[in-house]
Every structure is written in C-alpha cells, then in structure tokens.
C-alpha cells in the first residue's frame, strides 16, 4: 500500500477530461501478478519479467490463478492437462506439463512468496504475504463491498474503483477457455458499477469516476453516458458533454453498424 496521495488521470471514452486527486491503495510495481488489463508479472525488485513467460507458461499461470479463485482446491491436474496439452498423447502431455510446472515454479520464486501446490490430484496457487494479484484483490474487494451493503465505507469504495480502473480481465489474451472467466468478471464489474451510479448519484465527482470506469468495461454503456452527460451539463460543461456524446455515437455506429437514436437533450432529463 502506498500512503501518499497521487494524481490519478481518468480515461473518458479515449480522451482524458477529468483529473481526480485520490489516494492510491495498491502497488503493482513489484512482487505482482497482474491479470486486469494486460498480463504482467513483476519480480521482487520491480523488474518486468513478463517476457520470461512463454505462451504455455503464461496460460498455465493464468489457468491456476483463475481456477484457484473459483475453488480453493484449484483445478484437476487432468483437466489442466486436457486444456493446455490437448494436442499431445497422454505420456507426452504429462511430460510437457511437468516440465512447464517446474519452469513456472522457478519463475514464481522470483516474484515472491507464491507457489504452485499439487495435492490430491489438484493444482492450485498458494498465496503468501507480500505478493499482489489484482484479480484476486478485485474479487475480494467486491465480495466485501456486497457483504457490507451498497453503502460500504468510502475507503472500500475507492479501493474498488481503483482496481476496476485497471480494466477488464486479460483484454489482450484470446483463448476459448478464458471466455467464461472474462464474461463472469465483466458481468460482476458492470453490475456493480451500474449499481454504484445509482447509489452515488448525488456525489457528482464519484459518479463521473464511476462512469469513466464503466466505459472501460462496457464502451457502449448508455447508463454511463447518461450519468456523465447529465452531470457535465449541470456543471455547465456543455461542450465537454457534447464531445463525450459524439464519441459515444461514433463508437456505437462503428460497433453496431447503426446510429445511436437517443438525442443528447434526452440525457439531460
């Protein structure tokens, strides 16, 4: 955790328009495995060792992290083998798996106190103090927030917004078996952010933050558009509201092949 307050620049539909001064709670600069946004791994000294992960090593690490968060047992060794080495005969697949596991364990030693555990036919990741994983932290923060109710404390709210600002789960990694995890995380994030738009509706600065982050997870989210344009209009920033709306309309047409039919004036109501 960083105790100092820093300036955070929030992306708004690909253009930076608002700058908020917020406290930073998380540090992905060392001893970190990052799955939100793009895949990244940092060692104990802060060196970026992402390049040391071959596609197979990367896939194995991601698989173990995701399945361990889904269930403490992790994933059946056979299932992991079937997913990652489906093109190999049984013996060859087993040998390849064991070699990859050894290499992964060596790399994780550089990251910090985190290990791959094989137990009772399952593989899982065991986390210890000092190693940060953004995906794991995001799920934990969201879980805490739901347990505390929609009006959770401001610190937890800001932690959630900070970590959701990292972006969707593994946005640049495209493999079939990831889809269910991506969809689940996306749905969880979007539902929470939409709810927060309503809960925080009288806190304009927070709503603007939430809308910006919601656009990261769902670029065509109409609730984020309406909330942002409405507040900018109230604040007298009609030109910025028009720019946000115009970019949304362009992205809407580029993505769906049709015009966005809700006029800007309707968003101010």
Where are the regions a protein language model picked out?
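Short boundary/linker motifs that mark transitions into or out of structured domains
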Residues: 1-56, 118-122
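Short amphipathic alpha-helical recognition elements used for nucleic-acid or partner binding
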Residues: 48-84, 104
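Short acidic-capped amphipathic helix/loop micro-motif used as an active-site/signal-coupling element
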Residues: 142-178, 248-252, 256-257
